[in-house]
Every structure is written in structure tokens, then in C-alpha cells.
Amino acid sequence: MAVLAPLIALVYSVPRLSRWLAQPYYLLSALLSAAFLLVRKLPPLCHGLPTQREDGNPCDFDWREVEILMFLSAIVMMKNRRSITVEQHIGNIFMFSKVANAILFFRLDIRMGLLYITLCIVFLMTCKPPLYMGPEYIKYFNDKTIDEELERDKRVTWIVEFFANWANDCQSFAPIYADLSLKYNCTGLNFGKVDVGRYTDVSTRYKVSTSPLTKQLPTLILFQGGKEVMRRPQIDKKGRAVSWTFSEENVIREFNLNELYQRAKKLSKAGDNIPEEQPVAPTPTRVSDGESKKDK
């Protein structure tokens, strides 16, 4: 399954891959990930490179390089077991490939290793992964509008994502959250986002840490009646996030989106004449990642 999951996701996303290759971030990242392969296998780049092969062929891998590449493959397969989107699969491949490339280049020549590390640093400083720009029904808040919107109509249920553009998990979750907003957004159930990397006082007010060590980004909070009802991931006593997978199925089940959606549709049909009701918190049920999504 560790091998089949990324392959199936890759096949279903072939049209998207063609658009990725046209973007500088993915193109340059792919070149950096395959740098050692190109240098070692393509003449005349491989001519004159040191090698430990018995036949002295500088344009082929020696046994130690093969071991490193096999270890890289095993690490990528283990990490991709928990990946949900194609972006996460590709990101893991790029990240661990660059680490393996750095090790392999340092084995050849320390100068080549330093050059490769320098190129990676320049790449990280100049190229940022493209943000999700697809369709969505999401309202973006700032440090002032979030409280006003939550208090404006307490009959409306809000699901708000606290995110930061620099967090890879937030970028991977963006298309999933957008798809959920397209399916479930209605008059009584709204979706919102706030950039806590930009509005730090919001992160303090809603107790969402932006430190990479706490792994609290992204955080989803359900508001009913203007008050927080539940959040994912949960936080332990040390202030760290309890491990939770941000898949579409998990969000639907943990937040009871099907039930909230049906209740919100009744609210929209009844109009504005009904009195405000006390919010009812959904009953969170933790389920495995492999279960299928309920039919709405």
C-alpha cells in the first residue's frame, strides 16, 4: 500500500502535473532532486568523477551510492504512507531527494557538496511553492473582522482555518479545505480562514501557536453561537498538537459536516424569522483514515 497509494494518486493527477512542470518552483525543485543522477550518468559531466567501482567506470553508480538511493526510496515510501494529497507525495520526494543528493555530492567532492547546498539555500530563499488559486467559498479574515463576523449572526456556524503560508501542511490542506467549502457552504454554515502568520495577535487570542515545533498549523476551529465548540488538532499538556490527519474524510466525520449541513439548510429555508437556538456541539468520533466518505 505504501507504493500503490502514491502511484494511484499520481495517475489521477496527471493533468495537474503538466501544470506543475510549467511553474518555476516545481521545475527547479525537480532539477535539484535529480542533480546527482544527471551529473553521474550524463557524459561529459560524469567524466573525471571519482568512483569506487572495480571497473573504474565514472558514469555509473558504485555500491555505496546504490545503498544510499535504496535507503532514500525506503524513507520516501514510509513517509508517503501518511500523505493525503499529491502535493504531499511530491513534497516528500523532493525533500528527501535533496538530502540524499547532498550526501552523495559530499562523498564525491566536498566542493561539489558545498556548491549543491548553496544552490538549495538560494532556491529556498528565492522560490516559494505556489499558493492554491482554485475555486472556493471561503471568507478571509483579518485581526479585526474575525470577531465581528463571528458575533454578527450567532445562528451561523463557522468553521475557521488558522493557517500560515510558510507552513507546508497548510499548503497541502488548502485544496482539501476549498473542496469542502464548495460542498458544504450554505447560509447557516460558512467557512473562513485567517493568516496567523500575518496577524499574530489572532494566534494569541485563539491560542494557536505558530511555532513549527508545536505542529499546530493548520488548526480548524468550529464556532457555534460565536463560541468555540471544538478544534483539531487537539493540544496536549505540553502545548503540542496531538497527531491528526487533515484528510477530507476526517474533517467530515470529526466536525459532523453532514449533520451541520442539513441543519443549516433548514435554517436557510425557515428564513430570518426563527428565534436563535442554542448551539449543539457535534459529537467528535475518531475514525481511521482509510474509511470512505459518507454520502451527503
UniProtKB/Swiss-Prot annotation:
Superkingdom of origin: Eukaryota
Topological region Extracellular: 49-102
PTM-bearing positions, type Phosphoserine: S211, S243, S288
Its membrane topology: Single-pass type I membrane protein
Domain remark in the UniProt entry: The thioredoxin domain lacks the 2 redox-active cysteines, suggesting that it lacks thioredoxin activity. The di-lysine motif confers endoplasmic reticulum localization for type I membrane proteins.
Keyword presence, Disulfide bond: yes
Entry protein name: Thioredoxin-related transmembrane protein 2
Source organism of this protein record: Macaca fascicularis
Placement of sequence motif Di-lysine motif: 293-296
Keywords: Disulfide bond, Endoplasmic reticulum, Membrane, Mitochondrion, Phosphoprotein, Signal, Transmembrane, Transmembrane helix
SUPFAM superfamilies cross-referenced by the UniProt entry: Thioredoxin-like (SSF52833)
Primary role: Endoplasmic reticulum and mitochondria-associated protein that probably functions as a regulator of cellular redox state and thereby regulates protein post-translational modification, protein folding and mitochondrial activity. Indirectly regulates neuronal proliferation, migration, and organization in the developing brain.
One family name in Pfam for this protein: Thioredoxin
Matching CDD domains: TMX2 (cd02962)
InterPro entries: Thioredoxin-like_sf, Thioredoxin_domain, TMX2, TMX2_thioredoxin_dom
One GO CC term on file: mitochondria-associated endoplasmic reticulum membrane contact site
Topology Cytoplasmic: residue spans: 126-296
Disulfide pattern: none
Sample GO molecular function, one term: disulfide oxidoreductase activity
Location of the protein in the cell: Endoplasmic reticulum membrane; Mitochondrion membrane
Residue ranges of the TM segments: 103-125
Region (Disordered) residue spans: 269-296
Signal sequence range: 1-48
Residue span, Thioredoxin domain: 114-269
A GO biological process held by the record: brain development
Complex and partners: Monomer. Homodimer; disulfide-linked. Occurs in both reduced and oxidized monomeric form. Oxidative conditions increase homodimerization. Interacts with CANX. Interacts with ATP2A2.
